[in-house]
Regions:
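Residues located in well-ordered beta-strands
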Residues: 1, 36-38, 96, 100, ...
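Extracytoplasmic/secreted envelope proteins and their assembly/folding machinery
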Residues: 77, 83, 98, 129, ...
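Conserved active-site neighborhood of the chymotrypsin/trypsin-like protease fold
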Residues: 4-87, 91-92, 126
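Terminal peptide-recognition signature
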Residues: 10-14, 37, 51, 80, ...
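Residue-level recognition of beta-strand microenvironments
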Residues: 3-5, 40-42, 104, 123, ...
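Short flexible coil/turn linkers enriched for glycine and charged/polar residues
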Residues: 31-33, 42-46, 112-114, 173-176, ...
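Active-site region of chymotrypsin-like
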Residues: 56-68, 97-157, 198-201
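C-terminal cap/linker of serine protease catalytic domains
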Residues: 37, 139-198
Protein backbone atom coordinates (compact mmCIF):
# COMPACT_ATOMS: atom_id res chain seq x y z
CA UNK A 1 0.00 0.00 0.00
CA UNK A 2 1.12 3.56 -0.71
CA UNK A 3 1.75 5.38 2.58
CA UNK A 4 2.95 8.71 1.20
CA UNK A 5 3.26 10.17 -2.29
CA UNK A 6 5.65 12.92 -3.30
CA UNK A 7 7.40 13.06 -6.66
CA UNK A 8 10.82 12.78 -5.08
CA UNK A 9 9.71 9.86 -2.94
CA UNK A 10 6.72 7.53 -2.98
CA UNK A 11 6.61 5.31 0.12
CA UNK A 12 5.12 1.82 -0.08
CA UNK A 13 4.56 -0.57 2.84
CA UNK A 14 5.04 -4.26 2.06
CA UNK A 15 5.60 -7.52 3.94
CA UNK A 16 9.30 -8.26 4.24
CA UNK A 17 8.72 -11.92 3.39
CA UNK A 18 7.42 -10.96 -0.06
CA UNK A 19 10.61 -9.14 -1.06
CA UNK A 20 13.47 -10.44 1.10
CA UNK A 21 14.84 -12.83 -1.54
CA UNK A 22 14.60 -10.33 -4.41
CA UNK A 23 17.81 -9.12 -6.06
CA UNK A 24 16.09 -5.91 -7.13
CA UNK A 25 12.70 -4.25 -6.74
CA UNK A 26 10.35 -2.90 -9.38
CA UNK A 27 7.08 -1.16 -8.52
CA UNK A 28 4.19 -1.22 -11.00
CA UNK A 29 1.59 1.54 -10.77
CA UNK A 30 -2.00 1.51 -12.02
CA UNK A 31 -1.20 3.27 -15.31
CA UNK A 32 1.36 0.55 -16.20
CA UNK A 33 4.33 2.73 -15.21
CA UNK A 34 7.11 0.60 -13.70
CA UNK A 35 9.82 2.22 -11.58
CA UNK A 36 12.74 0.82 -9.59
CA UNK A 37 12.27 0.67 -5.83
CA UNK A 38 14.68 0.49 -2.91
CA UNK A 39 14.34 -0.55 0.72
CA UNK A 40 14.20 2.51 2.97
CA UNK A 41 13.81 0.69 6.29
CA UNK A 42 12.71 -2.68 7.67
CA UNK A 43 10.98 -3.66 10.89
CA UNK A 44 12.21 -7.19 11.56
CA UNK A 45 9.93 -7.73 14.55
CA UNK A 46 6.70 -7.06 12.66
CA UNK A 47 7.95 -8.29 9.28
CA UNK A 48 7.25 -5.07 7.39
CA UNK A 49 9.42 -3.09 4.98
CA UNK A 50 9.11 0.47 3.73
CA UNK A 51 10.02 0.80 0.05
CA UNK A 52 10.90 4.12 -1.55
CA UNK A 53 10.39 4.98 -5.22
CA UNK A 54 11.72 8.03 -7.06
CA UNK A 55 8.75 9.21 -9.13
CA UNK A 56 10.32 12.32 -10.68
CA UNK A 57 10.31 10.62 -14.10
CA UNK A 58 6.49 10.50 -14.12
CA UNK A 59 4.51 13.31 -15.70
CA UNK A 60 1.89 15.16 -13.63
CA UNK A 61 -1.03 13.13 -14.99
CA UNK A 62 0.67 9.86 -14.07
CA UNK A 63 1.71 11.06 -10.64
CA UNK A 64 -1.77 12.31 -9.73
CA UNK A 65 -3.06 8.74 -10.04
CA UNK A 66 -0.85 7.66 -7.12
CA UNK A 67 -2.97 8.09 -4.01
CA UNK A 68 -1.68 7.37 -0.50
CA UNK A 69 -3.93 5.26 1.69
CA UNK A 70 -5.78 6.91 4.55
CA UNK A 71 -4.96 5.40 7.94
CA UNK A 72 -8.10 4.47 9.84
CA UNK A 73 -8.80 4.05 13.54
CA UNK A 74 -8.64 0.32 14.20
CA UNK A 75 -9.63 0.95 17.83
CA UNK A 76 -13.06 1.77 16.43
CA UNK A 77 -13.41 -1.57 14.62
CA UNK A 78 -16.20 -3.67 16.14
CA UNK A 79 -17.25 -7.29 15.97
CA UNK A 80 -19.57 -7.74 12.99
CA UNK A 81 -18.06 -4.89 10.96
CA UNK A 82 -17.79 -5.44 7.20
CA UNK A 83 -14.15 -5.32 6.06
CA UNK A 84 -12.29 -5.68 2.77
CA UNK A 85 -8.92 -7.34 2.22
CA UNK A 86 -6.83 -6.07 -0.69
CA UNK A 87 -3.40 -6.71 -2.12
CA UNK A 88 -2.90 -10.43 -2.65
CA UNK A 89 -5.46 -12.18 -0.40
CA UNK A 90 -6.03 -14.88 -3.02
CA UNK A 91 -2.30 -15.24 -3.66
CA UNK A 92 -2.53 -13.09 -6.79
CA UNK A 93 -1.74 -9.39 -7.11
CA UNK A 94 -4.77 -7.07 -7.31
CA UNK A 95 -7.11 -9.66 -5.78
CA UNK A 96 -9.59 -8.70 -3.07
CA UNK A 97 -12.07 -10.26 -0.68
CA UNK A 98 -14.63 -9.19 1.86
CA UNK A 99 -15.93 -10.56 5.13
CA UNK A 100 -16.77 -9.65 8.69
CA UNK A 101 -14.85 -9.08 11.89
CA UNK A 102 -15.53 -12.18 13.97
CA UNK A 103 -13.45 -11.46 17.05
CA UNK A 104 -11.09 -8.83 18.44
CA UNK A 105 -8.33 -9.96 20.80
CA UNK A 106 -7.18 -7.05 22.95
CA UNK A 107 -3.90 -6.87 24.85
CA UNK A 108 -2.25 -9.76 22.98
CA UNK A 109 1.25 -10.12 24.42
CA UNK A 110 4.09 -9.49 22.02
CA UNK A 111 7.66 -8.24 22.22
CA UNK A 112 7.86 -4.97 24.16
CA UNK A 113 4.13 -4.63 24.74
CA UNK A 114 0.60 -5.57 23.82
CA UNK A 115 -1.42 -5.19 20.63
CA UNK A 116 -4.84 -5.83 19.18
CA UNK A 117 -5.38 -8.71 16.78
CA UNK A 118 -8.41 -8.66 14.49
CA UNK A 119 -9.95 -11.97 13.38
CA UNK A 120 -12.04 -11.98 10.20
CA UNK A 121 -13.72 -14.60 8.00
CA UNK A 122 -11.98 -13.35 4.91
CA UNK A 123 -9.34 -14.44 2.39
CA UNK A 124 -5.81 -13.46 3.31
CA UNK A 125 -2.24 -14.37 2.41
CA UNK A 126 0.15 -12.70 4.82
CA UNK A 127 3.42 -13.52 3.04
CA UNK A 128 2.16 -12.10 -0.27
CA UNK A 129 0.78 -8.91 1.26
CA UNK A 130 -2.80 -8.45 2.40
CA UNK A 131 -4.14 -5.25 3.93
CA UNK A 132 -7.46 -4.77 5.71
CA UNK A 133 -9.78 -1.82 5.00
CA UNK A 134 -13.04 -0.60 6.49
CA UNK A 135 -16.01 0.44 4.37
CA UNK A 136 -14.70 4.03 4.31
CA UNK A 137 -11.63 2.83 2.40
CA UNK A 138 -9.34 3.39 5.39
CA UNK A 139 -6.50 1.04 6.29
CA UNK A 140 -7.20 -0.65 9.64
CA UNK A 141 -4.78 -3.59 9.64
CA UNK A 142 -2.43 -5.90 7.82
CA UNK A 143 -2.34 -9.67 7.59
CA UNK A 144 -0.20 -11.81 9.86
CA UNK A 145 -0.07 -15.56 10.36
CA UNK A 146 1.61 -15.37 13.77
CA UNK A 147 -1.63 -15.64 15.73
CA UNK A 148 -3.63 -18.03 13.60
CA UNK A 149 -5.04 -21.02 15.46
CA UNK A 150 -3.67 -24.52 14.92
CA UNK A 151 -7.14 -25.75 13.96
CA UNK A 152 -8.33 -24.34 10.64
CA UNK A 153 -11.38 -22.25 11.52
CA UNK A 154 -11.29 -20.13 8.38
CA UNK A 155 -10.44 -17.08 10.49
CA UNK A 156 -7.58 -14.88 9.29
CA UNK A 157 -5.63 -12.61 11.60
CA UNK A 158 -4.70 -8.95 11.16
CA UNK A 159 -2.57 -6.62 13.24
CA UNK A 160 -4.17 -3.32 14.25
CA UNK A 161 -2.79 -0.32 12.35
CA UNK A 162 -3.52 2.07 15.23
CA UNK A 163 -1.03 0.21 17.43
CA UNK A 164 1.60 0.70 14.74
CA UNK A 165 1.25 4.35 13.68
CA UNK A 166 4.26 5.51 15.71
CA UNK A 167 6.49 2.81 14.22
CA UNK A 168 5.11 3.58 10.76
CA UNK A 169 6.28 7.17 11.10
CA UNK A 170 9.78 5.98 12.00
CA UNK A 171 9.92 3.65 8.97
CA UNK A 172 8.72 6.48 6.73
CA UNK A 173 11.66 8.59 7.90
CA UNK A 174 14.15 5.75 7.43
CA UNK A 175 14.61 5.28 11.18
CA UNK A 176 14.94 1.81 12.63
CA UNK A 177 12.16 0.88 15.05
CA UNK A 178 13.82 0.35 18.47
CA UNK A 179 12.99 -2.71 20.53
CA UNK A 180 14.18 -3.90 23.94
CA UNK A 181 13.12 -7.49 23.28
CA UNK A 182 11.06 -7.82 26.47
CA UNK A 183 8.24 -10.36 26.50
CA UNK A 184 6.04 -10.29 29.59
CA UNK A 185 4.59 -13.41 31.17
CA UNK A 186 2.14 -13.73 34.00
CA UNK A 187 3.37 -15.78 36.96
CA UNK A 188 0.92 -18.67 37.30
CA UNK A 189 -0.05 -20.30 40.58
CA UNK A 190 2.02 -23.33 39.56
CA UNK A 191 5.10 -21.18 39.02
CA UNK A 192 4.48 -19.47 42.36
CA UNK A 193 4.37 -22.86 44.09
CA UNK A 194 7.80 -23.61 42.63
CA UNK A 195 9.26 -20.56 44.33
CA UNK A 196 9.03 -17.86 41.67
CA UNK A 197 7.82 -14.60 43.26
CA UNK A 198 5.25 -12.46 41.50
CA UNK A 199 6.55 -9.76 39.20
CA UNK A 200 7.69 -9.17 35.63
CA UNK A 201 10.29 -11.47 34.10
Amino acid sequence: VVIDARKEEVLILAPTEAIETADSLEVAFSDSAVLPGAVKQTDSRMGLTMIRVDATSLDDAQFEKIKPVKLGNSYGVRQGDLVISMGSPAGMVHSSSYGFISYIAKNVQMTDGNARVLYADIKSKADAGTFLFNTEGELVGWATDRYEQDVDTGMKTFMSISDYKGALELLSNGIQVPYLGIEGQEVTSEMEKNGMPSGIY
